[in-house]
Amino acid sequence: MSWRYLCGMMGAEKGDLIMSENQDTKKVLLLALSGFELLEFSAFAEVLGWAKLEGGLAVEYDTAGFAREVRSTFDVPVTVDRVLWRRGAGVCSPVSVCAEDYDALAIPGGFEEYGYYEEAYRPDTAGLIRAFHKAGKPIASICVGALALGSSGILEGKKATTYALSGGHRQKQLAEFGAEVLTDEPIVVDGNLITSCGPSTAAGVAFQLLEMLTDRESAERVKKLMGFTPDH
Protein backbone atom coordinates (compact mmCIF):
# COMPACT_ATOMS: atom_id res chain seq x y z
CA MET A 1 0.00 0.00 0.00
CA SER A 2 1.11 3.58 -0.57
CA TRP A 3 0.71 6.03 2.26
CA ARG A 4 0.84 9.15 0.10
CA TYR A 5 -2.11 11.33 1.08
CA LEU A 6 -4.31 8.45 2.25
CA CYS A 7 -4.91 10.09 5.60
CA GLY A 8 -7.63 12.33 6.97
CA MET A 9 -10.12 11.22 4.34
CA MET A 10 -13.17 12.21 6.37
CA GLY A 11 -14.03 14.50 3.50
CA ALA A 12 -14.63 18.20 3.73
CA GLU A 13 -17.31 19.47 1.40
CA LYS A 14 -15.99 20.77 -1.89
CA GLY A 15 -14.97 24.38 -1.53
CA ASP A 16 -14.79 24.26 2.29
CA LEU A 17 -11.00 24.62 2.33
CA ILE A 18 -9.08 27.04 0.16
CA MET A 19 -5.34 27.42 0.62
CA SER A 20 -3.86 30.86 0.27
CA GLU A 21 -2.06 31.21 -3.04
CA ASN A 22 0.90 32.89 -1.35
CA GLN A 23 1.21 30.20 1.30
CA ASP A 24 4.57 28.46 0.88
CA THR A 25 4.22 24.69 0.89
CA LYS A 26 6.17 22.95 3.64
CA LYS A 27 7.35 19.50 2.62
CA VAL A 28 8.34 16.73 5.02
CA LEU A 29 10.48 13.69 4.27
CA LEU A 30 8.96 10.76 6.20
CA LEU A 31 11.61 8.10 6.61
CA ALA A 32 10.58 4.42 6.55
CA LEU A 33 13.54 2.41 7.79
CA SER A 34 13.32 -1.38 7.78
CA GLY A 35 11.24 -2.57 10.73
CA PHE A 36 9.70 0.84 11.42
CA GLU A 37 6.68 1.11 13.73
CA LEU A 38 3.44 1.58 11.79
CA LEU A 39 1.81 3.47 14.65
CA GLU A 40 4.61 6.03 14.72
CA PHE A 41 4.83 6.29 10.93
CA SER A 42 1.08 6.73 10.57
CA ALA A 43 0.96 9.49 13.21
CA PHE A 44 3.08 11.71 10.96
CA ALA A 45 1.06 10.70 7.90
CA GLU A 46 -2.28 11.30 9.62
CA VAL A 47 -1.46 14.66 11.17
CA LEU A 48 0.15 16.04 8.00
CA GLY A 49 -2.65 14.58 5.89
CA TRP A 50 -5.36 16.13 8.05
CA ALA A 51 -3.47 19.43 8.12
CA LYS A 52 -3.57 19.58 4.34
CA LEU A 53 -6.99 18.12 3.59
CA GLU A 54 -9.10 19.28 6.51
CA GLY A 55 -6.99 22.14 7.85
CA GLY A 56 -6.27 23.79 4.51
CA LEU A 57 -2.57 24.10 5.35
CA ALA A 58 0.17 24.03 2.73
CA VAL A 59 1.95 20.94 4.04
CA GLU A 60 2.71 17.64 2.35
CA TYR A 61 5.12 14.74 2.63
CA ASP A 62 7.08 12.15 0.71
CA THR A 63 7.78 8.72 2.15
CA ALA A 64 11.26 7.30 1.59
CA GLY A 65 13.22 4.14 2.33
CA PHE A 66 16.18 2.10 1.12
CA ALA A 67 13.86 0.00 -1.06
CA ARG A 68 10.62 0.67 -2.90
CA GLU A 69 8.81 -1.75 -0.59
CA VAL A 70 9.74 -1.58 3.07
CA ARG A 71 8.73 -4.17 5.65
CA SER A 72 7.57 -2.57 8.85
CA THR A 73 7.48 -4.10 12.30
CA PHE A 74 5.26 -7.20 12.23
CA ASP A 75 6.02 -7.60 8.50
CA VAL A 76 3.44 -5.19 7.08
CA PRO A 77 4.72 -4.09 3.63
CA VAL A 78 4.62 -0.40 2.71
CA THR A 79 5.43 1.09 -0.69
CA VAL A 80 7.32 4.38 -0.41
CA ASP A 81 7.42 7.35 -2.77
CA ARG A 82 11.19 7.74 -2.97
CA VAL A 83 14.17 5.40 -2.68
CA LEU A 84 17.10 6.81 -0.73
CA TRP A 85 20.29 7.26 -2.68
CA ARG A 86 23.14 5.10 -1.51
CA ARG A 87 26.55 6.18 -0.36
CA GLY A 88 28.88 6.71 -3.28
CA ALA A 89 26.08 7.37 -5.73
CA GLY A 90 27.37 10.88 -6.30
CA VAL A 91 25.38 14.10 -6.48
CA CYS A 92 21.64 14.19 -6.10
CA SER A 93 19.66 13.25 -9.17
CA PRO A 94 15.91 13.46 -9.90
CA VAL A 95 15.46 10.01 -8.37
CA SER A 96 17.58 10.77 -5.31
CA VAL A 97 16.49 12.18 -1.96
CA CYS A 98 18.11 15.48 -1.00
CA ALA A 99 17.62 17.47 2.20
CA GLU A 100 17.50 20.67 0.18
CA ASP A 101 14.17 19.57 -1.34
CA TYR A 102 12.44 19.32 2.05
CA ASP A 103 11.62 21.49 5.04
CA ALA A 104 11.72 18.81 7.74
CA LEU A 105 12.63 15.19 8.43
CA ALA A 106 10.40 12.74 10.33
CA ILE A 107 11.80 9.47 11.69
CA PRO A 108 9.59 6.82 13.31
CA GLY A 109 11.23 4.25 15.56
CA GLY A 110 11.18 0.50 15.06
CA PHE A 111 12.12 -2.95 16.33
CA GLU A 112 15.59 -4.49 16.38
CA GLU A 113 14.02 -7.88 15.60
CA TYR A 114 12.86 -6.51 12.24
CA GLY A 115 16.17 -4.97 11.23
CA TYR A 116 15.54 -1.39 12.32
CA TYR A 117 19.04 -0.57 13.54
CA GLU A 118 20.71 -2.02 10.46
CA GLU A 119 19.32 0.94 8.51
CA ALA A 120 19.06 3.45 11.37
CA TYR A 121 22.84 3.25 11.84
CA ARG A 122 23.76 3.26 8.15
CA PRO A 123 26.22 5.98 7.06
CA ASP A 124 23.64 6.99 4.43
CA THR A 125 21.03 7.59 7.13
CA ALA A 126 23.48 9.55 9.27
CA GLY A 127 24.48 11.68 6.30
CA LEU A 128 20.86 12.52 5.52
CA ILE A 129 20.17 13.47 9.14
CA ARG A 130 23.27 15.67 9.29
CA ALA A 131 22.26 17.42 6.07
CA PHE A 132 18.89 18.41 7.55
CA HIS A 133 20.53 19.47 10.80
CA LYS A 134 23.19 21.55 9.08
CA ALA A 135 20.45 23.39 7.18
CA GLY A 136 18.65 24.16 10.45
CA LYS A 137 15.56 22.19 9.46
CA PRO A 138 13.30 20.47 12.01
CA ILE A 139 13.97 16.79 12.67
CA ALA A 140 11.26 14.89 14.53
CA SER A 141 11.83 11.38 15.87
CA ILE A 142 9.60 9.06 17.86
CA CYS A 143 10.80 6.50 20.41
CA VAL A 144 14.05 4.81 19.27
CA GLY A 145 14.15 6.99 16.17
CA ALA A 146 16.24 9.21 18.46
CA LEU A 147 19.02 6.63 18.29
CA ALA A 148 19.38 7.29 14.56
CA LEU A 149 19.86 10.95 15.44
CA GLY A 150 22.35 10.03 18.14
CA SER A 151 24.30 7.79 15.79
CA SER A 152 24.63 10.68 13.34
CA GLY A 153 26.30 12.81 16.01
CA ILE A 154 23.78 15.64 16.08
CA LEU A 155 22.55 14.99 19.64
CA GLU A 156 25.90 15.52 21.32
CA GLY A 157 25.28 18.04 24.10
CA LYS A 158 21.57 18.22 23.24
CA LYS A 159 18.61 17.46 25.48
CA ALA A 160 16.80 14.37 24.23
CA THR A 161 15.00 11.17 25.16
CA THR A 162 14.11 7.78 23.72
CA TYR A 163 12.31 4.56 24.69
CA ALA A 164 12.12 4.56 28.48
CA LEU A 165 11.09 1.00 29.40
CA SER A 166 12.98 -2.33 29.39
CA GLY A 167 15.32 -1.09 32.09
CA GLY A 168 16.06 2.15 30.28
CA HIS A 169 18.81 0.55 28.18
CA ARG A 170 17.84 2.54 25.08
CA GLN A 171 18.17 5.77 27.06
CA LYS A 172 21.59 4.61 28.22
CA GLN A 173 22.54 4.02 24.59
CA LEU A 174 21.38 7.53 23.73
CA ALA A 175 23.53 8.95 26.52
CA GLU A 176 26.52 7.12 25.03
CA PHE A 177 26.00 9.21 21.89
CA GLY A 178 26.54 12.32 24.01
CA ALA A 179 22.92 13.36 24.54
CA GLU A 180 21.68 14.84 27.80
CA VAL A 181 18.86 12.36 28.39
CA LEU A 182 15.76 13.67 30.17
CA THR A 183 14.24 10.57 31.69
CA ASP A 184 11.07 12.21 33.03
CA GLU A 185 9.91 14.02 29.87
CA PRO A 186 7.71 12.20 27.29
CA ILE A 187 8.60 14.65 24.50
CA VAL A 188 11.79 16.70 24.45
CA VAL A 189 12.35 19.67 22.16
CA ASP A 190 15.83 21.16 21.85
CA GLY A 191 15.92 23.78 19.13
CA ASN A 192 14.70 22.11 15.93
CA LEU A 193 15.13 18.59 17.31
CA ILE A 194 12.20 16.57 18.66
CA THR A 195 12.64 13.25 20.47
CA SER A 196 10.22 11.16 22.53
CA CYS A 197 10.02 8.26 24.98
CA GLY A 198 7.73 5.78 23.20
CA PRO A 199 4.93 4.98 20.75
CA SER A 200 2.31 6.68 22.95
CA THR A 201 3.88 10.05 22.10
CA ALA A 202 3.48 9.60 18.34
CA ALA A 203 0.62 12.05 17.82
CA GLY A 204 2.18 14.60 20.16
CA VAL A 205 5.44 14.56 18.22
CA ALA A 206 3.60 14.91 14.91
CA PHE A 207 1.66 17.93 16.21
CA GLN A 208 4.88 19.46 17.53
CA LEU A 209 6.41 19.11 14.08
CA LEU A 210 3.32 20.65 12.48
CA GLU A 211 3.60 23.59 14.86
CA MET A 212 7.24 24.10 13.86
CA LEU A 213 6.28 24.09 10.19
CA THR A 214 3.28 26.39 10.59
CA ASP A 215 2.34 27.94 13.94
CA ARG A 216 0.76 26.99 17.25
CA GLU A 217 -2.70 28.21 16.27
CA SER A 218 -2.72 26.08 13.11
CA ALA A 219 -1.49 22.98 14.94
CA GLU A 220 -4.13 23.41 17.66
CA ARG A 221 -6.82 23.80 15.01
CA VAL A 222 -5.83 20.53 13.33
CA LYS A 223 -5.65 18.84 16.72
CA LYS A 224 -9.22 19.95 17.40
CA LEU A 225 -10.37 18.77 13.96
CA MET A 226 -8.94 15.34 14.74
CA GLY A 227 -10.76 15.20 18.07
CA PHE A 228 -7.76 15.53 20.36
CA THR A 229 -8.27 17.38 23.62
CA PRO A 230 -6.04 20.37 24.40
CA ASP A 231 -3.95 18.25 26.79
CA HIS A 232 -3.27 15.39 24.34
Residue ranges with predicted function:
Residues 3-11, 15-137, 147-156, 167-169, ...:
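Extended, subdomain-level signal for the structured scaffold at the beginning of enzyme domains
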Residues 189:
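Active-site anion-handling motifs in enzyme catalytic cores
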Residues 164:
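N-terminal Rossmann-fold cofactor-binding loop
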Residues 142-143:
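Short, thiol/selenol-centered motifs that function as redox-active sites or metal-ligating centers
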